[in-house]
Amino acid sequence: VVQSPTSKMISRLVDGQICAYALTPESWGLLSPLAVFRPSSEDRVVEHAVFADGKRAVYTTLNAAVCVTDTGDEVWRYAFEPQSDQVHGHRPGCVLSADEKVVWVYRPDAMAGRDRPDQWIALDASIGELLGQQDLETVGHSGQHLTHPSDGHVLLDVGEGQDGTVIYRALLTAGGISLDRYPWDDRCLIDLAPDGGRFLTVGHDQADAAIHAYPGGEVLLELPVEAFLPIEDVTDETPEFYLEWAGGFLTPDSVVVVLTGETEDDPEWSRSYRVDLRTGEIEARFDGHNEHPYDLQPLGDASWLTTDPAGHPIRWSQP
């Protein structure tokens, strides 16, 4: 699979296989996989990523990070020792660095019962060798990675359940991993702007969304949930509603945020809105064609993804 310089690869897990799709200027509607990666038969994939050339994929299981080729060969395997016998409560995550030389892996070792702190590791993407490691001050269930497009840093949001979330920023240097922790335990990282200059968070209590400057984290715009009143087609004067930990940057200057609520007449409803970051204005409802609040993935280029019933992505844009 040879991709143009303007393409971007994404992956979805469909029927136990990792499917790779190219986001090109010509790829719209229901996307067909350009490559399909078959994990080892004994592996249950947790998270995954694909290389831009469509020749290799990496994935995590509960006990390993693995790299495979599109022909089914295993390139390398990095085991998480000791092996965990805990089936639930921990989901190791992975992401490729922007230059695809490093695989970043979040290990929720505390919840896995390994009797050690959580850790964040960096592996050589070619051979699986450990390049850097940092213990984290978390007892997390899972972690979301976001790769900065140009400065080499990676962001990690560690979810600790009812205890909140912690956001880290890391850079792999000659001396190992340089780690910074943002000064919050109540902000959930949602998305990073296409140019890497801003990021979006939603409060762990789901009462507000905020746009922050990158890298410092200064709040540039705050959107309390009350700012969305009155809500279209909801007649209840005091509806119970909250912001979902969903949405993202639709363009460099606009984000999509998602509300969910309940009324007496409608047990549960969901609405998406586009927010203009240049003015702070909440614009009209955004129709994302998504089945539920978390089936909406803005791509930052005025397009977004949803999922078809079989698990393949559908790419949309506004007319």
Task: Give the ranges of each region predicted by the language model.
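A generic, well-ordered mixed alpha/beta core segment in the N-terminal half of proteins
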Residues: 67, 76-79, 91-95, 100-104
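Long, positively charged binding patches that form subdomain-scale interaction surfaces
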Residues: 195-202, 207-216
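Short consensus segments that form the blades of beta-propeller domains
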Residues: 56-57, 110-114, 262-266
